[in-house]
Structures are given as C-alpha cells and as structure tokens.
Regions:
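Alpha-helical transmembrane segments and their helix-start/interface "positive-inside/aromatic belt" motifs
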Residues: 1, 5-20, 93-113, 218-229
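Binding/recognition "hotspot" determinant
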Residues: 1-71
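Non-cytosolic segments of integral membrane proteins
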Residues: 12, 16, 20, 104-200, ...
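Internal transmembrane helix-loop-helix hairpins in multi-pass membrane proteins, together
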Residues: 33-64, 84, 110-145
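Hydrophobic, aromatic-rich alpha-helical transmembrane segments
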Residues: 59-63, 92-99, 162, 166, ...
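Hydrophobic alpha-helical transmembrane segments
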Residues: 65-77, 168-176
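Hydrophobic transmembrane alpha-helix segments characteristic of membrane transport
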Residues: 71-107, 200-215
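Alpha-helical transmembrane segments
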Residues: 206-223, 288-292
C-alpha cells in the first residue's frame, strides 16, 4: 500500500519536474529569441531597420534644412543685436572677427549636419557590433532540476520539490515574457527616436550662430542625439555582462548547496536576475550615456 503511494508521489513529482523543465526551456527559447532580436537590431542601421521610415526622415531633413538656412541668418542677426553695445563699437575688428568666426563655424556644422548624424550612427553601430559576439542569452536548466529532484530523500520531498519547481517555472515564464517584450521595445523605441531626432538637427544647429544666448538649442540636440546613438552600446554591454555577473553568482549558489529548495531559488535567480538587470540597463541606457559623456 505504502509502496504504491510512494511510487505515486514520486511519479507526480517527476511529472511536475518535467513540466517545469518544458516551461523553462520554452521561456529560455523566448529569451534567446529576444536576445537575438536585440543583437540584430543593435547592429542594424536605421536605414536597414526600415528603409521607408529612413527615407521619410531624409526627406524631412532636407525640408528642415531649407528652413534652417533662414534660421542661420536670423540667429546670426539676433546674436549680433544682443552683442552690440553701440553701432560704432559693433564694427570694431575684434567684434567683426568674433561674429564672422561664429557664423563660419555654425554654417560649416549646419552644412555637415547630415554627415555628422550618420557618422555617429555608423560609429555607434561599429561599437555595438564589436560586442555582439560576446553576448549570450541562452540557458539550460534540465540537469539542475533533475539533480535537485535526485536530492529529495523521501517521496513527500520529491513531490514538494517538483511542485515548487512547477510553480516557480510558471512565475518565471511570466517574468521572462514581460522582460523580453520590454527589451525588444527598448531597442525598437531607439529607432523611432532617431527617425524623429535627425531632421530636427537642421533646425537646432543654426542656433550656434546666435552665440551663448541661443546656442543651448544646438547643444541640447547634440546631447540628445548622442544619447540616442550610443545607448545601443550600453544595451550590448548590459546583455554581455548581465548573464556572466548575476548568472555566475546564482550558479555558484546552486553548485555549493545540497538543499533542493535552495537549488530552486538559485535556478530561478540565475534566469531572472540577468534578464531584469539587462532590461533595467537598457531602459536607462540614454541617461547612462549622458552621464558618461558629462551631459
């Protein structure tokens, strides 16, 4: 009688363990796919991501550049107006030279806005591509779960361990689905911001001709655009170190314990912590870039 009951408890525990393995492997496949999408998008140019959106952004930039040419003259005149103390003093050699240099620099940057914008994109993409090979988003927990089940010394513990694994696997799969979606959205949102930001550079850069009083508009655009460009590098760094940093700590916890419950907690931590860490870094990538660049 008790032998049959023990076999039943062991069988139910094994079924729960097998279900948890299947659920976690499915979640692992989802996370791996999300990581592959992120790596591919981080190493893809905005033109390669959506050629139609890039074409629209280019047309809009050319339109804004025509307006920017007029703004260049306007900001120069406004800067001249605010800098002069009297009409006679405004034509001194030092004033004329200073305003001439300011206008020449502003005009040169204005004419090179598209080149600078695409150059920053290309450079940030090369940085991200260099880290792509070191990014790993895969995991396999089959042996870990089976090892924990083998540590259960009684049928009751065997059943409880399998049941705990099943509940943890369900919760873990829900978390994986959420963070995978957030990770993909964080990367795709960057392209949308780039498509919007690039055309407005043609309107912001001419403010340099107005001097300190108006140049904050241009510097604001440069800070924002640089943050959009280089945040993919932060995303790739987050993906590269998250699994090694947090996953290694959780795996160390698993490897030094013979308690099934601790192994369950360590297994879930080895899956969830790298993901949540990576998503947190990706969501704050722009602010991290600004802090690193002193913006």
């Amino acid at each position: 009688m008790f032998g049959f009951l023990d076999d039943l408890l062991n069988s139910i525990g094994d079924v729960c363990a097998d279900l948890s393995i299947g659920i976690l492997n499915g979640s692992g496949g989802l996370w791996t796919s999300a990581g592959d999408v992120v790596v591919r998008y981080c190493t893809t140019t905005p033109e390669g991501f959506s050629s139609s959106a890039w074409s629209t952004s280019s047309v809009l930039f050319n339109t804004f550049q025509a307006v920017g040419a007029a703004l260049l003259v306007l900001f120069f005149l406004l800067g001249w107006y605010h800098d002069i103390e009297d009409v006679r003093g405004s034509f001194r050699m030092d004033n004329v030279l200073r305003m001439g240099i300011r206008l020449a620099v502003a005009e040169g940057l204005f004419n090179s806005t598209w080149t600078i914008a695409t150059g920053l994109l290309s450079y940030s993409g090369q940085l991200a591509s260099g880290l792509a090979s070191s990014v790993s988003t895969s995991f396999d927990i089959t042996d870990t779960i089976k090892g924990a089940m083998d540590l259960a010394d009684t049928p009751g513990n065997h059943l409880m361990t399998g049941f705990i694994f099943l509940i943890a696997a369900i919760l873990c799969s829900a978390i994986v689905a959420i963070v995978s979606t957030q990770l993909i959205l964080a990367v795709t949102k960057r392209f949308f911001k780039l498509y919007i930001a690039i055309p407005f550079g043609a309107l912001a850069i001419p403010s340099l001709a107005g001097g300190d009083r108006y140049s904050s508009m241009a510097f604001g655009w440069i800070r924002t655009y640089a943050g959009y460009c280089f945040e993919i590098f932060v995303m790739m760094v987050a993906l590269a170190i998250a699994n090694d940093l947090f996953g290694a700590g959780a795996n160390l916890l698993i490897g030094t314990s013979d308690n099934a419950f601790i192994i369950v907690i360590g297994t879930m931590a080895s899956i969830i912590l790298p993901m949540t860490c990576a998503v947190a870094f990706c969501n704050q990538a722009e602010s991290i870039v600004r802090q690193c660049l002193g913006f």
